[in-house]
């Protein structure tokens, strides 16, 4: 006797299959399969050959196979110890095409459809398509496309396949024509609208599209308005209602926002209650920056709560909770707060699992971690670990995820996921530097050699004025304590006569080798040492300024009108640096500072020294804008038998990295040579300061590659000497001084000071950093060489 169970009818009517006598399954057959393998079906079945079949298995089989999404219909039949499954497969998707989308990109729409299981080669389900189209329509409606029309078309193909074509007619966006506030007495509508990103129509809205309604932006705007009030003392401000009206053809919208301002409150007493365990309550109370009598600010409370949670987290209480109890006093217009702290369990890190480091060895990452295994969970150490791994430069993304350990409520595993970036390069590139022209370079480098963290580089470059070659190797962990050791071999030929710069009438040839060491002294500080042996050749030419000629005559030799210097220099370097920025790429907070000194040691043919100190500070003004303040000072001189700094080791100013708007290397003392050509030969002292407002390019898809800035620069290069047309040490009275006949000029900080202002663009291109700036000199003198537009393309070595 045979019993047929028709799945869809029974399940829709709520009828259970008829009771059968139990039997042992001897065979299972599947009919109706076209693409699905029988083995796949067997894997999903709740029974197998040899099992005892009873009257509950029919429904279970049907549910299991329907749940796969592979079938439109499933029937189960039994006869003589056999199971016969008859199925109707759903068609598979041959192609999925989208046309007409403008606001949303096709790739983004397809990715969204994939989340519903709608993709090429997947099984097609009409209900799923309807659900996905409805969700896509909601997305458009939320972006102000009220006339959106989405038409899906399903075309049946041979071999049980379908093509899906989705046609989108976005229609015109609804424009916001009016934004009105009701209930506001303290601040005007205009003032409140300035807090919002959505606007009424204006001159620039055709470009910014800020008058196109967007649900997400509107919700953010309401939060901004609330923040504005509550950060100015209005503790009990709230938005009562928002009313959005649309005209009949769905092209215009008006927004009415009803608010309750309430009274303006000042800070009262803020106290901490609860068990803070080993974290002293007095220590947490020091984090309470609110001052009684000052206007209440919600952002201040948010910052304080974050600091308290970080402090609790650094003691191992990763899941501490803080409940805030406000106690407003309507009579005194003050508000007290009680912060109830529930520390929860102290959490320990069981294991740290690292994934994504396909090339980089585990030890290279682990030696940067400050959060240890089997140690208390510490939020500050975890954040520092993330920063240190990011500063390696080997990874584009670093993320930590704490996963509770099953059965152990006080332990977590840390999953560290990394996204590796390319650290090796074979470069053949060309660039353009404004003052020296075409720069061609070739090099091979690897910053993460064989995944060990060591780096090696072989580089060469050629420009109109310079020929460079170098070979370097660095082991950042020469010792387990993080002492780095590096070696360098290099050669350089420099002839500025071939460039447009005013540093002319001499050339240098250098070859040397050195060893360097960097020692970490704290988490953020390093001390650097180095020794270099260098052979230097300097040649001056006929009619060179007397300053050059006198130096070569004193320390080198002359041949007619030309002169040359040859000799070995043994240089020692020492420096200290501190890096407390939050990013190696685009810092937004923190600072960099350093002191560096170089001395040509006794035994060198020339004996001189130089020292510099620099500082750069970053201050976040908002999520978008960062203020950068920087400065540098330097001094150089001779000692022993060398009474002055060699002219070819002078400081120079002007151009990118100094005072923009003035030609590179032209600031400081100047003289004429005997050809009557103006020469800049620099000074032994320098000072530069800069203020720069940094922000990403509006509308850029990747804010991490392009950055704009507005800047102001000031700087000076001087030597303290007095020059005139008869007795200048630089001209020897042979030609007229550039400052005018009979005039004298003392090279002081004030006299040589120049400043400028302008804008700049920095692009981290595949060829290297590209910099463009336009500056307007704010202090000009007749002898200055102005260059408002300056740029540097490609990389130089």
Curated annotation (Swiss-Prot):
The keyword Cytoplasm does not apply. InterPro entries: Bac_surfAg_D15 (IPR000184), BamA/TamA_POTRA (IPR010827), D15-like (IPR039910), OM_assembly_BamA (IPR023707), POTRA (IPR034746). Gene3D superfamilies: membrane protein fhac (3.10.20.310), membrane protein fhac: a member of the omp85/tpsb transporter family (2.40.160.50). It comes from the Bacteria. Residues 23-90, 91-171, 174-262, 265-344, 347-421 form the POTRA domain. Keywords: Cell outer membrane, Membrane, Repeat, Signal, Transmembrane, Transmembrane beta strand. GO terms for biological process: Gram-negative-bacterium-type cell outer membrane assembly; protein insertion into membrane. Its main location: membrane. It is found in: Cell outer membrane. One of its GO terms (cellular component) is cell outer membrane. Residues 1-21 form the signal peptide. Pfam families: Omp85, POTRA. The keyword Membrane applies. Present in outer membrane vesicle formulations which are used as vaccines in human. Belongs to the BamA family. NCBIfam families: OM_YaeT (TIGR03303). Part of the Bam complex. Part of the outer membrane protein assembly complex, which is involved in assembly and insertion of beta-barrel proteins into the outer membrane. This is Outer membrane protein assembly factor BamA. It comes from Neisseria meningitidis serogroup B (strain ATCC BAA-335 / MC58).
